[in-house]
């Protein structure tokens, strides 16, 4: 009986440890090509699932110059306001910007999914479905014309939400007058039928 209790206790501990992931800041550095691929693939996978479907959604790709700009933004540790436009204009193009902040270290996929999940409070062509909710991160993730991006992470020890993830998107989305129509509705790839990769 004692052996059975010991076995069940050990089994419970092992199961719990499988459910938790031990992350280190170095594991999430965007200089790592595997992390770059995770970020790009997550964005493209989510862009393929927009509802209503998009006929003109471009495929995202990684850009090291944009990643350097995102790194400068992350190093500022200013979680209260976005980088000034002059600080995220690259090659004459104004880029958009998303932040994710957390007291615990989270994967890039987790942060990107949290931006996308703002769609639960978004109605295409209308905007937020209730007062006080954010949808701008979602609309930037799915902005049809944004096709280059770069991201960076930083530890901001003096902030309560000390882990700071920043992505920048070029050209930027959330254009005034079109903010709540981040793409054109239609059959995927209808606007670019000869240059399509699984809906993008």
UniProtKB/Swiss-Prot annotation:
Task: Extract the signal peptide range.
Answer: 1-22
| Assigned keywords, A-Z | Calcium channel impairing toxin, Disulfide bond, Ion channel impairing toxin, Neurotoxin, Potassium channel impairing toxin, Secreted, Signal, Toxin
Q: Which cysteines are joined by disulfide bonds?
A: 77-156, 95-170, 151-167, 189-196
SMART domains, per the entry? SCP
Where in or outside the cell is it found? Secreted
Q: What range(s) does the SCP domain occupy?
A: 41-169
Q: GO terms for CC?
A: extracellular region
What's this protein's function?
A: Blocks ryanodine receptors, and potassium channels.
Would you tell me the protein name for this molecule?
Cysteine-rich venom protein VAR8
* Species name: Varanus acanthurus
């Amino acid at each position: 009986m004692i052996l059975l209790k010991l076995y069940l206790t050990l089994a419970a501990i092992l199961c719990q440890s499988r459910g938790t992931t031990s992350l280190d800041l170095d594991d999430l550095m965007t200089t790592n090509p595997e992390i770059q691929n995770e970020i790009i693939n997550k964005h493209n996978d989510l862009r393929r699932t927009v509802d209503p479907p998009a006929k003109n959604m471009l495929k995202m790709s990684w850009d090291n110059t944009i990643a350097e700009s995102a790194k400068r933004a992350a190093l500022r540790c200013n979680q209260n306001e976005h980088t000034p436009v002059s600080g995220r204009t690259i090659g004459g193009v104004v880029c958009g910007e998303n932040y994710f902040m957390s007291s615990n270290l989270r994967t890039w996929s987790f942060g990107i999914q949290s931006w996308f999940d703002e769609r639960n409070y978004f109605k295409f062509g209308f905007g937020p479905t209730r007062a006080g909710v954010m949808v701008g991160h979602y609309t930037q993730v799915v902005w049809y014309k944004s096709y280059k991006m770069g991201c960076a992470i930083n530890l901001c020890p003096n902030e309560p939400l000390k882990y700071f993830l920043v992505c920048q998107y070029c050209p930027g989305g959330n254009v005034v007058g079109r903010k709540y129509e981040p793409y054109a509705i239609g059959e995927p790839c209808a606007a670019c039928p000869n240059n399509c990769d699984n809906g993008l």
